From Swiss-Prot:
EC number: 2.1.2.-
InterPro entries: GCST_C, GCV_T_N, GcvT/YgfZ/DmdA, GcvT/YgfZ_C, TrmE/GcvT_dom1
GO molecular function: transaminase activity
Keyword Transferase among UniProt keywords: yes
Role, per record: Component of the heme-dependent oxidative N-demethylase (HODM) enzyme, that catalyzes the NADPH-dependent oxidation of dimethylamine (DMA) to methylamine (MA) and formaldehyde. Functions in bacterial methylated amine catabolism, linking alkylamine oxidation to the tetrahydrofolate C1 pool. The gamma subunit of HODM may act as an aminomethyltransferase involved in the detoxification of formaldehyde released by the alpha subunit; this process requires tetrahydrofolate (THF).
Subunit structure: The heme-dependent oxidative N-demethylase (HODM) is a heterotetramer composed of a catalytic alpha subunit, a FMN/2Fe-2S-dependent oxidoreductase beta subunit, a gamma subunit with putative aminotransferase activity, and a delta subunit of unknown function.
Any Pfam family: GCV_T
Species whose genome carries this gene: Ectopseudomonas mendocina (strain ymp) (Pseudomonas mendocina)
Keyword match Mitochondrion: no
Protein's UniProt name: Heme-dependent oxidative N-demethylase gamma subunit
């Protein structure tokens, strides 16, 4: 069990479900429960699942300089956000290399909340805010309960007026079970889902109520590792597990470009003035690898670190993998040489498995993103 400095208000709930509360981002996190991860994956893909993702870093930036601070730090045009709108963004270093991703929520005219993963973007923003008219608050009282899956909206519609009309990447302030919450139509699953931001004191009651009243919808508690299964299918990267910080280059320091990661879409069209912009644009066409999918033969999942071979030489490495009993496919995300990143290139997997595979475009599931953006 982790000796973490951040404590989830749902700690006792997770322990009761069989979690050992392994550390992530400084918080004891329910990576697994006593129940089967395949059941968690199936619930989120076919019904809905509830997950505690409070280990995400939630930081408020408030003041006259908040917008300009975030606009320079991220790849998005922050000025286009209005209160109630959010956007997925990346943060780069001066070398144009990826250091973090985040969601930026505009909560007021001069107020933003940034939700980070495990990169170093928060620390960079703290340094950049020094001497500027912006207050920074790391908010660990705020908990994040993620309700994901096709039935999530049906359940919430019984309790939150207007939730069906909330567009993708928008949020609203409301009440859930008579407790104040911010509900955001975001998630990390590829499904239509919602993140429920609430006070720590309210998190256990909201968690319990969703699971109790959501039984008729098939809602179950889901462990953090289920996200790995979902993200493989939906092409969602997880720093540092897909990055050169985990799989280092032989002769270069760690640091991946957005072109290599397939995250260049996060740069707002025409935006030039952001940290690392010059190097970002210069590095286009100089990809050392590409993130791409791998479809494996058989009914077993590979493991991170398994190598990929083509014509007798190593051409890549698997970073995350899963087997879906819903589709009966064994799938993986991989770092491969650029010429291998084409549909159908034959591969051999070596390591925990020894099997044939092919390079496969990402995402495997819902490539047009119709599920997560559905209306009504």
């Amino acid at each position: 069990m982790a000796n973490s400095w951040r404590i989830s208000a749902l700690r006792e709930r997770h322990l009761a479900l069989g979690s050992q509360l392994e550390d992530w981002n400084g918080m004891g996190t329910a990576w697994t429960y006593a129940s089967d991860l395949a059941d968690h994956h199936e619930a989120i893909r076919t019904r809905a699942g509830l997950m505690d993702v409070s280990g995400l870093k939630k930081v408020h930036y408030v003041g006259p300089h908040a917008e300009s601070l975030l606009d320079y730090a991220t790849t998005r045009d922050i000025g286009k956000l209005y209160p109630g709108k959010s956007v997925y963004a990346c943060l780069l270093d001066e070398d144009g290399k990826f250091i973090d991703d985040c969601i930026v929520y505009r909560t007021g005219p001069n107020a933003f909340m940034v939700v980070h993963g495990a990169g170093t973007g928060h620390e960079m923003l703290i340094r950049s805010a020094q001497g500027r008219q912006v207050a920074v608050l790391f908010d660990d009282d705020l908990h994040d309960l993620s309700l994901q899956g096709p039935r999530a909206v049906d359940f919430l519609a019984e309790h939150v007026p207007g939730i069906r009309d909330l567009p993708y990447f928008h949020h609203l302030q409301t009440k859930l079970f008579d407790r104040p919450v911010m509900i955001s139509r975001t998630g990390y699953t590829g499904e239509r889902g919602y993140e429920i931001f609430c006070k720590a004191a309210d998190a256990p009651a909201i968690w319990d109520a969703i699971l109790e009243q959501g039984k008729g919808y098939g809602i179950i508690p889901c462990a953090f590792t289920a996200l790995d299964w979902l993200r493989v299918e939906s092409y969602l990267l997880f720093f540092p597990y897909d990055n050169s910080q985990m799989y280092p280059f032989a002769d270069q320091k760690a640091g991946d470009t957005l072109w290599e990661l397939g995250l260049d879409f996060t740069v707002s069209p025409g935006k030039q003035d952001f940290r690392g912009a010059g190097e970002h644009y210069r590095l286009k066409g100089q990809e050392r690898f590409k993130i791409f999918g791998v479809l494996l033969d058989g009914h077993q999942a590979a493991q991170g670190g398994d190598t990929l071979w083509h014509d007798g030489r190593q051409v890549g490495v698997i970073t995350c993998s899963m087997y879906s009993r819903l589709t009966e496919r064994s799938m993986a995300i991989a770092r491969v040489e650029p010429q291998i990143a084409e549909q159908g290139v034959p591969l051999q997997v070596r390591g925990s498995l020894d099997c044939a595979a092919i390079a496969h475009s990402l995402p495997f599931d819902d490539p047009e993103k119709k599920k997560r953006t559905a209306k009504g």
